[in-house]
Amino acid sequence: MTRLAVSLPGLNLKNPIMPASGCFGFGAEYAEYYDLSVLGSIMVKATTLEPRRGNPVIRVAETPGGMLNAIGLQNPGLDVVMAEKLPWLAEHFPDLPIIANVAGYTTEDYVRVCEVISTAPNVAAVEINISCPNVKRGGITFGTNVTAAHDLTQAVVAAASVPVYVKLSPNVTDITEIARATADAGADGLTLINTLTGMRINLARRTPVIANATGGLSGPAVLPIAVRMIDAVTRVVDIPVIGMGGVMTSADALELMMAGASAVGVGTANFTDPLACPKIINGLEPLMDDLSIASLEDLRTQVRQSR
Protein backbone atom coordinates (compact mmCIF):
# COMPACT_ATOMS: atom_id res chain seq x y z
CA MET A 1 0.00 0.00 0.00
CA THR A 2 1.08 3.56 -0.63
CA ARG A 3 1.07 6.26 2.02
CA LEU A 4 -2.31 7.55 0.85
CA ALA A 5 -4.08 4.21 0.42
CA VAL A 6 -7.01 3.32 2.68
CA SER A 7 -9.27 0.29 2.84
CA LEU A 8 -12.96 0.33 3.74
CA PRO A 9 -15.72 -2.25 3.19
CA GLY A 10 -15.91 -2.77 -0.57
CA LEU A 11 -13.36 -0.04 -1.22
CA ASN A 12 -9.61 -0.38 -1.63
CA LEU A 13 -8.73 3.21 -2.40
CA LYS A 14 -5.44 4.56 -3.77
CA ASN A 15 -6.17 7.72 -1.80
CA PRO A 16 -9.03 8.80 0.50
CA ILE A 17 -10.39 11.66 -1.61
CA MET A 18 -13.65 11.42 -3.52
CA PRO A 19 -16.17 13.93 -4.87
CA ALA A 20 -19.29 13.95 -2.72
CA SER A 21 -22.61 13.01 -4.27
CA GLY A 22 -24.51 15.89 -5.83
CA CYS A 23 -21.39 17.96 -6.46
CA PHE A 24 -19.87 16.05 -9.38
CA GLY A 25 -22.74 14.86 -11.55
CA PHE A 26 -22.07 11.35 -12.82
CA GLY A 27 -18.39 12.07 -13.49
CA ALA A 28 -18.45 12.89 -17.19
CA GLU A 29 -19.11 16.53 -16.37
CA TYR A 30 -15.63 16.84 -14.83
CA ALA A 31 -13.69 14.48 -17.08
CA GLU A 32 -12.79 17.35 -19.41
CA TYR A 33 -10.85 19.00 -16.58
CA TYR A 34 -8.64 16.11 -15.44
CA ASP A 35 -8.10 12.35 -15.47
CA LEU A 36 -10.68 11.04 -13.02
CA SER A 37 -8.58 7.96 -12.34
CA VAL A 38 -6.51 10.04 -9.90
CA LEU A 39 -9.47 10.00 -7.52
CA GLY A 40 -9.92 7.47 -4.76
CA SER A 41 -13.56 7.00 -5.77
CA ILE A 42 -16.56 8.95 -7.04
CA MET A 43 -19.81 9.27 -5.13
CA VAL A 44 -22.10 9.82 -8.10
CA LYS A 45 -25.24 11.92 -8.11
CA ALA A 46 -28.31 10.47 -6.37
CA THR A 47 -30.33 7.96 -8.36
CA THR A 48 -34.06 7.44 -7.84
CA LEU A 49 -36.39 4.83 -9.26
CA GLU A 50 -38.07 7.28 -11.64
CA PRO A 51 -36.62 10.44 -13.21
CA ARG A 52 -36.92 13.62 -11.14
CA ARG A 53 -37.05 17.15 -12.51
CA GLY A 54 -35.98 18.66 -9.21
CA ASN A 55 -37.08 21.86 -7.53
CA PRO A 56 -38.03 25.09 -9.32
CA VAL A 57 -35.35 27.70 -9.93
CA ILE A 58 -33.67 29.60 -8.26
CA ARG A 59 -31.99 26.55 -6.69
CA VAL A 60 -28.58 27.84 -5.60
CA ALA A 61 -27.44 30.96 -3.77
CA GLU A 62 -24.11 32.05 -2.33
CA THR A 63 -23.86 32.78 1.39
CA PRO A 64 -20.98 34.05 3.53
CA GLY A 65 -18.64 31.09 3.85
CA GLY A 66 -20.68 28.76 1.69
CA MET A 67 -23.79 28.24 -0.39
CA LEU A 68 -27.42 27.19 -0.15
CA ASN A 69 -28.83 24.65 -2.57
CA ALA A 70 -32.22 23.09 -3.13
CA ILE A 71 -31.73 20.99 -6.25
CA GLY A 72 -34.36 18.42 -5.31
CA LEU A 73 -32.45 15.30 -6.38
CA GLN A 74 -32.82 15.99 -10.10
CA ASN A 75 -31.66 12.87 -11.96
CA PRO A 76 -32.54 10.82 -15.05
CA GLY A 77 -33.78 7.80 -13.09
CA LEU A 78 -32.51 4.28 -12.54
CA ASP A 79 -32.93 2.99 -16.09
CA VAL A 80 -30.82 5.75 -17.64
CA VAL A 81 -28.17 5.54 -14.93
CA MET A 82 -27.80 1.80 -15.53
CA ALA A 83 -27.88 2.07 -19.32
CA GLU A 84 -25.74 5.18 -19.81
CA LYS A 85 -24.12 6.86 -16.81
CA LEU A 86 -22.44 3.93 -15.07
CA PRO A 87 -21.37 2.19 -18.31
CA TRP A 88 -19.66 5.42 -19.43
CA LEU A 89 -17.61 5.48 -16.25
CA ALA A 90 -16.81 1.77 -16.58
CA GLU A 91 -15.61 2.26 -20.16
CA HIS A 92 -13.45 5.32 -19.53
CA PHE A 93 -12.25 4.62 -15.97
CA PRO A 94 -12.52 0.85 -15.49
CA ASP A 95 -10.42 0.75 -12.32
CA LEU A 96 -12.26 3.55 -10.51
CA PRO A 97 -14.60 2.24 -7.79
CA ILE A 98 -17.97 3.96 -7.80
CA ILE A 99 -20.20 4.65 -4.81
CA ALA A 100 -23.79 4.90 -6.02
CA ASN A 101 -25.94 7.32 -4.05
CA VAL A 102 -29.56 6.16 -3.78
CA ALA A 103 -32.67 8.08 -2.72
CA GLY A 104 -36.38 7.37 -2.63
CA TYR A 105 -39.80 8.26 -1.33
CA THR A 106 -40.44 4.85 0.28
CA THR A 107 -38.52 1.88 1.61
CA GLU A 108 -39.61 -0.03 -1.47
CA ASP A 109 -38.04 2.63 -3.70
CA TYR A 110 -34.70 2.38 -1.92
CA VAL A 111 -34.74 -1.40 -1.97
CA ARG A 112 -35.53 -1.66 -5.67
CA VAL A 113 -32.90 0.87 -6.72
CA CYS A 114 -30.25 -0.74 -4.51
CA GLU A 115 -31.08 -4.21 -5.81
CA VAL A 116 -30.48 -3.09 -9.37
CA ILE A 117 -27.71 -0.53 -9.07
CA SER A 118 -25.52 -2.78 -6.92
CA THR A 119 -25.29 -5.20 -9.87
CA ALA A 120 -23.41 -2.66 -12.00
CA PRO A 121 -19.85 -4.01 -12.34
CA ASN A 122 -18.15 -0.76 -11.32
CA VAL A 123 -20.38 -0.04 -8.30
CA ALA A 124 -18.31 -0.99 -5.27
CA ALA A 125 -20.77 0.30 -2.66
CA VAL A 126 -24.07 2.11 -2.31
CA GLU A 127 -24.70 5.21 -0.24
CA ILE A 128 -28.30 5.58 0.87
CA ASN A 129 -29.36 9.18 1.11
CA ILE A 130 -31.66 9.32 4.11
CA SER A 131 -30.66 12.87 4.91
CA CYS A 132 -31.40 15.21 2.01
CA PRO A 133 -33.14 18.28 3.44
CA ASN A 134 -34.68 19.44 0.17
CA VAL A 135 -37.28 16.81 -0.66
CA LYS A 136 -40.72 17.23 0.85
CA ARG A 137 -41.45 13.51 0.94
CA GLY A 138 -39.42 10.59 2.22
CA GLY A 139 -35.76 11.29 2.86
CA ILE A 140 -35.83 13.67 5.76
CA THR A 141 -38.31 11.46 7.65
CA PHE A 142 -36.00 8.46 7.41
CA GLY A 143 -32.97 10.50 8.40
CA THR A 144 -34.36 12.09 11.54
CA ASN A 145 -36.22 9.14 13.05
CA VAL A 146 -34.25 6.39 14.79
CA THR A 147 -36.70 3.59 14.03
CA ALA A 148 -37.23 4.63 10.42
CA ALA A 149 -33.48 4.91 9.82
CA HIS A 150 -32.89 1.48 11.35
CA ASP A 151 -35.64 -0.25 9.40
CA LEU A 152 -34.70 1.34 6.07
CA THR A 153 -31.05 0.43 6.53
CA GLN A 154 -31.95 -3.14 7.44
CA ALA A 155 -34.10 -3.50 4.32
CA VAL A 156 -31.43 -2.07 2.01
CA VAL A 157 -28.65 -4.20 3.51
CA ALA A 158 -30.75 -7.29 2.82
CA ALA A 159 -31.32 -6.23 -0.79
CA ALA A 160 -27.95 -4.87 -1.89
CA SER A 161 -25.14 -7.10 -3.15
CA VAL A 162 -22.41 -4.59 -2.22
CA PRO A 163 -21.54 -2.83 1.06
CA VAL A 164 -24.03 -0.21 2.23
CA TYR A 165 -23.07 3.22 3.55
CA VAL A 166 -25.71 5.44 5.16
CA LYS A 167 -25.52 9.22 4.70
CA LEU A 168 -26.51 10.94 7.93
CA SER A 169 -28.25 14.26 8.40
CA PRO A 170 -26.82 16.87 10.78
CA ASN A 171 -30.33 18.27 11.24
CA VAL A 172 -31.02 16.18 14.33
CA THR A 173 -30.74 16.61 18.08
CA ASP A 174 -28.23 13.77 18.51
CA ILE A 175 -26.57 12.33 15.41
CA THR A 176 -25.03 9.49 17.43
CA GLU A 177 -28.49 7.98 17.98
CA ILE A 178 -29.07 7.68 14.23
CA ALA A 179 -25.51 6.40 13.77
CA ARG A 180 -26.02 3.65 16.34
CA ALA A 181 -29.36 2.67 14.83
CA THR A 182 -28.00 2.31 11.30
CA ALA A 183 -24.90 0.47 12.50
CA ASP A 184 -27.09 -1.93 14.49
CA ALA A 185 -29.17 -2.48 11.34
CA GLY A 186 -26.11 -3.74 9.47
CA ALA A 187 -24.70 -0.70 7.70
CA ASP A 188 -21.13 -1.30 6.54
CA GLY A 189 -20.20 2.36 6.92
CA LEU A 190 -21.54 5.87 7.37
CA THR A 191 -21.07 9.13 5.50
CA LEU A 192 -21.47 12.49 7.21
CA ILE A 193 -22.35 15.23 7.24
CA ASN A 194 -24.93 16.19 4.68
CA THR A 195 -25.96 19.84 4.44
CA LEU A 196 -27.58 21.84 7.22
CA THR A 197 -30.98 23.36 6.53
CA GLY A 198 -30.73 27.12 6.08
CA MET A 199 -32.46 30.11 4.57
CA ARG A 200 -31.64 33.62 3.30
CA ILE A 201 -34.03 36.44 2.40
CA ASN A 202 -33.71 38.91 -0.46
CA LEU A 203 -34.29 42.26 1.23
CA ALA A 204 -35.54 44.03 -1.89
CA ARG A 205 -38.04 41.29 -2.78
CA ARG A 206 -38.75 40.33 0.85
CA THR A 207 -38.79 36.70 -0.21
CA PRO A 208 -36.37 33.79 0.21
CA VAL A 209 -33.43 33.88 -2.18
CA ILE A 210 -34.17 30.38 -3.46
CA ALA A 211 -37.54 29.18 -4.72
CA ASN A 212 -37.77 26.29 -2.27
CA ALA A 213 -37.41 28.82 0.59
CA THR A 214 -35.03 26.59 2.56
CA GLY A 215 -31.96 24.81 1.26
CA GLY A 216 -28.90 22.89 2.31
CA LEU A 217 -26.01 24.96 3.65
CA SER A 218 -22.56 23.72 2.63
CA GLY A 219 -19.05 25.05 2.24
CA PRO A 220 -16.31 26.17 4.64
CA ALA A 221 -18.81 27.45 7.21
CA VAL A 222 -19.91 23.90 8.09
CA LEU A 223 -16.44 22.37 8.57
CA PRO A 224 -16.37 22.76 12.38
CA ILE A 225 -19.78 21.09 12.60
CA ALA A 226 -18.55 18.20 10.46
CA VAL A 227 -15.46 17.79 12.64
CA ARG A 228 -17.56 17.69 15.81
CA MET A 229 -20.10 15.22 14.47
CA ILE A 230 -17.50 12.89 12.94
CA ASP A 231 -15.64 12.85 16.24
CA ALA A 232 -18.85 12.08 18.13
CA VAL A 233 -20.04 9.35 15.76
CA THR A 234 -16.71 7.53 15.51
CA ARG A 235 -16.61 7.30 19.29
CA VAL A 236 -19.84 5.28 19.43
CA VAL A 237 -19.76 3.03 16.33
CA ASP A 238 -17.10 0.64 15.04
CA ILE A 239 -17.93 0.93 11.34
CA PRO A 240 -15.90 3.33 9.16
CA VAL A 241 -16.99 6.87 8.37
CA ILE A 242 -16.47 8.78 5.14
CA GLY A 243 -16.30 12.36 6.35
CA MET A 244 -17.47 15.41 4.45
CA GLY A 245 -18.63 18.93 5.06
CA GLY A 246 -16.71 22.09 4.21
CA VAL A 247 -13.54 20.44 2.89
CA MET A 248 -11.65 22.89 0.68
CA THR A 249 -7.99 22.00 1.30
CA SER A 250 -5.66 19.12 2.12
CA ALA A 251 -5.52 20.39 5.69
CA ASP A 252 -9.30 20.21 5.95
CA ALA A 253 -9.24 16.62 4.72
CA LEU A 254 -6.60 15.62 7.28
CA GLU A 255 -8.59 17.36 10.00
CA LEU A 256 -11.61 15.17 9.27
CA MET A 257 -9.38 12.09 9.36
CA MET A 258 -7.94 13.18 12.69
CA ALA A 259 -11.54 13.45 13.91
CA GLY A 260 -12.05 9.81 12.96
CA ALA A 261 -12.96 9.70 9.27
CA SER A 262 -11.44 6.91 7.18
CA ALA A 263 -11.91 8.73 3.86
CA VAL A 264 -13.08 12.17 2.78
CA GLY A 265 -15.75 13.48 0.43
CA VAL A 266 -15.29 16.86 -1.25
CA GLY A 267 -18.44 18.75 -2.18
CA THR A 268 -18.84 22.50 -2.62
CA ALA A 269 -15.15 22.95 -3.46
CA ASN A 270 -15.83 21.28 -6.83
CA PHE A 271 -18.09 24.19 -7.76
CA THR A 272 -15.58 26.89 -6.86
CA ASP A 273 -12.65 25.02 -8.44
CA PRO A 274 -13.15 22.04 -10.79
CA LEU A 275 -9.60 20.92 -9.92
CA ALA A 276 -10.26 20.91 -6.17
CA CYS A 277 -9.99 17.15 -5.70
CA PRO A 278 -6.65 16.59 -7.46
CA LYS A 279 -5.23 19.65 -5.69
CA ILE A 280 -6.28 18.22 -2.33
CA ILE A 281 -4.80 14.83 -3.22
CA ASN A 282 -1.51 16.39 -4.35
CA GLY A 283 -1.25 18.37 -1.14
CA LEU A 284 -1.68 15.46 1.23
CA GLU A 285 1.82 13.95 1.20
CA PRO A 286 3.71 17.24 1.72
CA LEU A 287 1.39 18.02 4.62
CA MET A 288 1.87 14.53 6.04
CA ASP A 289 5.64 15.07 5.86
CA ASP A 290 5.28 18.30 7.83
CA LEU A 291 3.16 16.53 10.45
CA SER A 292 5.31 13.36 10.62
CA ILE A 293 2.46 11.12 9.45
CA ALA A 294 3.94 7.98 7.89
CA SER A 295 0.73 6.86 6.18
CA LEU A 296 -2.99 7.44 6.39
CA GLU A 297 -3.53 3.91 7.68
CA ASP A 298 -1.09 4.73 10.49
CA LEU A 299 -3.10 7.86 11.22
CA ARG A 300 -6.33 5.86 11.34
CA THR A 301 -4.74 3.42 13.78
CA GLN A 302 -3.47 6.23 15.99
CA VAL A 303 -6.89 7.88 16.10
CA ARG A 304 -8.59 4.60 17.04
CA GLN A 305 -6.04 3.87 19.75
CA SER A 306 -6.47 7.33 21.25
CA ARG A 307 -10.18 6.76 21.87
Curated annotation (Swiss-Prot):
SUPFAM superfamilies: FMN-linked oxidoreductases. Substrate binds at K45, N69, A70, I71, G72, L73, N129, N194, T195. Binds 1 FMN per subunit. FMN binds at S21, K45, A46, N101, N129, K167, I193, G219, G245, G246, G267, T268. One of its GO terms (cellular component) is cytoplasm. Pathway: Pyrimidine metabolism; UMP biosynthesis via de novo pathway; orotate from (S)-dihydroorotate (NAD(+) route): step 1/1. It is found in: Cytoplasm. Keywords: Cytoplasm, Flavoprotein, FMN, NAD, Oxidoreductase, Pyrimidine biosynthesis. It catalyses: (S)-dihydroorotate + NAD(+) = orotate + NADH + H(+). Its EC number is 1.3.1.14. GO terms for molecular function: dihydroorotate dehydrogenase (NAD+) activity. The keyword Cytoplasm applies. The active site is at C132 (nucleophile). GO terms for biological process: 'de novo' pyrimidine nucleobase biosynthetic process; 'de novo' UMP biosynthetic process. It is an enzyme of class 1 (oxidoreductase). Belongs to the dihydroorotate dehydrogenase family. Type 1 subfamily. Heterotetramer of 2 PyrK and 2 PyrD type B subunits. Catalyzes the conversion of dihydroorotate to orotate with NAD(+) as electron acceptor. This is Dihydroorotate dehydrogenase B (NAD(+)), catalytic subunit. It comes from Cutibacterium acnes (strain DSM 16379 / KPA171202). The gene is pyrD.
